[in-house]
């Protein structure tokens, strides 16, 4: 079996590559030219890397033709919703146009390939009801969210009209030690470790009472494997169904390094506060539980502790890895 993964050097791509390699897959990963991927190679030494920009349609076609994947996951693309208004051309080029090219190219592969599209809860950002389900009408507001919905529609069309086994997983927030430091949960775990070590003395955040449906990233990647291998291709909401405030994550992260009085180190600043936030984003994954047998393996408190423990380990050894 041959897997092709876009965005392979990111959190989800690295976790997926590790899981698939353990299952005996031959794994090829796409990264944007110039991307640093040494971390990926520490986790999955045998992965083959192809440097292709998702805006390079001929490059995408060439890789798919040469690899002839039996399974393909699209985890790549523009991933910063807040910046999407300033980069809308890029957003639609890499989040929508590239998906069309992938689907067209896969049609020419003879092994009846299967395709997974990583979608986003942001397609529901304008919905004022919670929890959100697969049957709800999406209400995207940002260019990023619109691009994610359009990509889903392309996959649905390829499934319906072309007979391609294509599915979209509607991912809610999911975290792990491999999350980038630019994401708020990793920013918190990283700072907690450094403050406990005496390397920093404050952490500046935006609104710490913002609430999100945060889950454990490896569980979501496992869901994508279940979806792409299912008998019937269907789209699913992938979420915990539980909302937590950021302040609670901060509390648990600092507690993991023995700091109870976290309020002495954490400060909310207007510079870090979003001018417009989304409605309450909580997903209902009952369909995935029933159809796929999907389950969560790590709770919220444990997730915070694991992330902090890895950041502590990396203070001693920057190349320390975490067992996926």
Predicted features along the sequence, with ranges:
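N-terminal Rossmann-like NAD(P)+-binding domain of SDR-like oxidoreductases, especially those catalyzing
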Residues: 1-174, 298, 322-324
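Generic recognition of short, well-ordered alpha-helical segments
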Residues: 15, 42, 62, 86, ...
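C-terminal substrate-binding subdomain of Rossmann-fold SDR/epimerase-dehydratase oxidoreductases
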Residues: 29, 185-186, 192-324
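Residue-level signature of the cytosolic catalytic core of signaling kinases
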Residues: 43, 52, 56, 180-181, ...
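Charged catalytic carboxylate motif
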Residues: 59, 98-101, 150, 187, ...
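Residues that recognize and position ribonucleotide moieties
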Residues: 116, 130, 167, 181, ...
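The catalytic Tyr-centered alpha-helix of NAD(P)H-dependent dehydrogenases
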Residues: 136, 140-147, 177, 181-185, ...
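Hydrophobic alpha-helix immediately C-terminal to the catalytic Tyr-X-X-X-Lys motif of short-chain
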Residues: 146, 150-158, 187-191, 249, ...
């Amino acid at each position: 079996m041959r897997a092709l993964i876009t965005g392979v050097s990111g959190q989800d791509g690295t976790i997926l590559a590790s899981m698939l390699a353990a299952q005996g897959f031959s794994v090829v990963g796409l990264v944007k030219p110039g991307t640093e991927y040494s971390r990926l190679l520490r986790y999955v030494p045998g992965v083959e890397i192809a440097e292709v920009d998702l805006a390079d349609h001929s490059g995408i076609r060439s890789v798919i033709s040469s690899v002839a994947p039996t399974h393909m996951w699209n985890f790549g693309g523009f991933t910063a919703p807040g910046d999407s208004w300033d980069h809308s051309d890029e957003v639609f080029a890499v989040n929508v146009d590239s998906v069309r090219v992938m689907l067209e190219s896969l049609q020419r592969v003879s092994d009846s390939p299967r395709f997974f599209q990583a979608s986003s809860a942001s397609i529901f950002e304008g919905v004022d009801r919670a929890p959100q389900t697969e049957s709800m009408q999406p209400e995207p507001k940002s260019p990023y969210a619109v691009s994610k919905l359009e990509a889903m529609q392309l996959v649905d069309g390829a499934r319906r009209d072309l007979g391609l086994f294509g599915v979209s997983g509607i991912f809610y927030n999911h975290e792990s030690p491999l999350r980038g430091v630019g994401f708020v949960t990793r920013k918190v775990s990283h700072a907690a470790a450094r403050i406990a070590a005496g390397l920093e003395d404050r952490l500046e955040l935006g609104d710490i009472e913002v609430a999100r449906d945060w889950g454990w990233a490896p569980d979501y990647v496992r869901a994508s494997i279940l979806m792409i291998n299912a008998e019937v291709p269907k789209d699913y909401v992938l979420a915990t169904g539980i909302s937590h405030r950021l302040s609670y994550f901060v509390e648990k992260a600092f507690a993991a390094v023995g700091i109870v009085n976290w309020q002495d180190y954490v400060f909310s600043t207007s510079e870090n506060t979003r001018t417009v936030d989304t409605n309450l984003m909580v997903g209902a994954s009952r369909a995935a539980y029933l159809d796929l047998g999907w389950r969560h393996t790590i709770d919220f408190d444990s997730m915070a502790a694991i992330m902090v423990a890895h950041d502590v380990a990396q203070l001693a050894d920057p190349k320390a890895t975490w067992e996926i």
